[in-house]
Amino acid sequence: MDMRTSFLCVTYVILLTGSACGLQITSTGQTSIEKASGESVKLDCQFTLASDDSGPLDIEWSLQPSDNQKEEKVVIVYSGDRAFEHYYDPLKGRVHFNSPDPKNGDASMNIMGLKATDTGTYQCKIKKVPGIASRKYLLTVMVRPSKPKCSAEGQTYVGKNMVLKCSSVEGTQPMEYIWERTSGNKLLPPLAILDKVTGTMTLKNATGDASGTYRCQAKNRVGTEECVVEVTITQPPNTAGIIAGVIICILLLLILLALILFCCCRARHKKKYEKEIAYEIREDVPPPKSRVSTARSFTSVGSQRSSLGSMSPSNLHEYSKPQYDKIPSEEYDRPPSHAPIPPPSRMAGPNLSRMGAIPVMIPAQNKDGSIV
């Protein structure tokens, strides 16, 4: 029984020794890696083979799904002394083996131009029958903070509150904002309130000493970006003078409007008065005599000339020869005169005949000027 027990122990030790000296992955170090987008990463997978590993060498890198119910995605494969690097379309052209001949013991994988979508768990699996070994890496691709934008909000007067803001559009959380002063004594105002999460700094009851240049840094675990802002605290303006000036301007404007309205009303009243005077003048002037009626009166007088010769000279009035060199229109267009007309002088009939006068009969007329 003692010899049999000793034989079994020796056999067991030999088997354990052979197993320990078989296929092994010798890479060490962190299995959780954080990288910034745009960088490259090397997932190390060094291995050694045992003398009894006689089967074909197969190397496979795969992306483990976050959900256990999903299948893993094969990324890159080495089999039959050939490398196949186009299995996974999202990493196509950006992934390859670190060694041109992985069978020499280097199955490490390089990923170029990292993206945030490359985040995941990657597994290196090496198989050479009867040996099998694997190693996993948790890769986290983080986005650097984008260039932050600094701004100042609030009144820049002494005794007022001002808020300095800093914000990055892109960047993987957690991300914090740090404010510092780069001018003067480089110390923040004593009443400054910082918020590292939102990136705001409130300057309460600001004084002239708070004026200067301030810098904000946006940072996370993979990068840092910054921006600056100038702050100038001044004395508040004289509001009483501004109010007085506004009131004076309003009064001047009202006076100007009143003058314009007064001038318009005066001009309108004057024009209306002139029209009324013109209407009164036209009503006082009698209408001119008709030329047709005057011509008819001369015609009737001429037709009766022959019968006037037998009338006695005492019944005749003198008749002077009309002057034809004057324009008749002037006589008709001339307004009537209000001066009294002197009575015509009487002369004897024989004297009138010697003077060449022609006796005419003047028909009687009524008040409106018509012949009776």
Swiss-Prot record:
Organism's domain of life? Eukaryota
**What keywords does the record list, in alphabetical order?**
Cell adhesion, Cell junction, Cell membrane, Disulfide bond, Glycoprotein, Immunoglobulin domain, Membrane, Receptor, Repeat, Signal, Tight junction, Transmembrane, Transmembrane helix
Q: Name one Pfam family in it.
A: V-set
Segments crossing the lipid bilayer: 242-262
State which residues carry a glycan (glycosylated).
Answer: 205
**InterPro entries tied to this protein:** EJ_Adhesion_Regulator, Ig-like_dom, Ig-like_dom_sf, Ig-like_fold, Ig_sub, Ig_sub2, Ig_V-set
What the entry says about domains is:
The Ig-like C2-type 1 domain may mediate homodimerization.
Functional summary from the UniProt entry: May function as a homophilic cell adhesion molecule and be essential for tight junction integrity. May also be involved in transepithelial migration of leukocytes through adhesive interactions with jaml. The interaction between both receptors may also mediate the activation of gamma-delta T-cells, a subpopulation of T-cells residing in epithelia and involved in tissue homeostasis and repair.
- Record protein name field: Coxsackievirus and adenovirus receptor homolog
